[in-house]
Regions:
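Membrane-embedded alpha-helical hairpins and interfacial helices in multi-pass inner-membrane proteins
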Residues: 44, 120-200
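Helix-loop junctions at the membrane-solvent interface of multi-pass transporters
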Residues: 33, 37, 61, 87-88, ...
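Residue-level signature of transmembrane alpha-helical entry/exit and packing/kink sites
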Residues: 16-24, 48-55, 67, 98, ...
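Alpha-helical transmembrane segments in multi-pass membrane proteins
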Residues: 23-34, 55, 59, 70-78, ...
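Structural signal for the C-terminal ends of transmembrane alpha-helices
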Residues: 61-65, 112-120, 189-194
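Hydrophobic transmembrane alpha-helices
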Residues: 1-70
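Short helix-perturbing small/polar motifs within transmembrane alpha-helices
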Residues: 2-12, 33, 92-142
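Interfacial aromatic-anchored transmembrane helix boundaries in multi-pass membrane proteins
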Residues: 36-47, 75-109
Length: 200
């Protein structure tokens, strides 16, 4: 074994191309599974879901490159018609809808979570991992709020910044804070399953 392989026994490792491809597929599937836990809110087109937990954990566990690939696969599957988006949604129209920015932000967030964890939390310290998850979550909001504002503008609706935050940030902030903490707690177990020490 070398420095990039498991420090502990693993379910499978990432030492071959086929296993990395499997890990990418599992990461995409994990996000798709959590996306089915969705709670629509009456005052916003953005639902509450668990998929952000999957995005953060997949990115941090797989690493920046494989994590981003997993989320690209997830988006491709949904755009192709598989019911993997929130609540079983599917179709390319989702990428142009009110939640399209959030979906596109998943790729950036997975990459950022992986990159930051590899750089600052490879020693398994929970606080740096938690901060990395928060930064990755901020990337989702940056893309998501921009996409939501663009969608509303195209629909002929005007919204102020406070109004935009009321639709696309504040209802989800506490839950996403908790999901970031949970992802940081679960990360060592995910690394163990993948046979990772913190870096690929």
């Amino acid at each position: 074994m070398n420095a990039t392989t498991a420090l502990v026994p693993s379910v499978f490792d990432l030492n071959t191309t086929s296993r990395r491809a499997l890990a990418v597929a599992l990461g995409a599937g994990f996000v798709a599974l959590l996306a089915q836990v969705a709670l629509p809110l009456p005052f916003t087109p953005v639902p509450v879901t668990l998929q952000t937990l999957g995005v953060l954990l997949a990115g941090a566990a797989l690493g920046s490159r494989l994590g981003a690939q997993a989320l690209l696969l997830y988006l491709a599957a949904g755009a192709a018609g598989l019911p993997v988006f929130a609540g079983g949604g599917a179709g390319v129209g989702w990428l142009a809808g009110p939640t399209g920015g959030y979906l596109l932000g998943f790729v950036a967030a997975a990459w950022l979570a992986g990159a930051l964890v590899e750089r600052f939390a490879a020693d398994r310290r929970p606080l740096p991992a938690f901060l990395a998850m928060l930064a990755a979550g901020a990337a989702i909001y940056a893309f998501g709020l921009a996409g939501l504002a663009g969608w509303m503008a195209l629909a002929g609706k005007t919204v102020s910044l406070p109004g935009l935050l009321a639709l696309g940030f504040w209802p989800f902030a506490l839950g996403d804070l908790l999901k970031a903490g949970l992802a940081a707690v679960l990360l060592p177990a995910a690394w163990k399953g993948l046979g990772r020490s913190g870096r690929i």
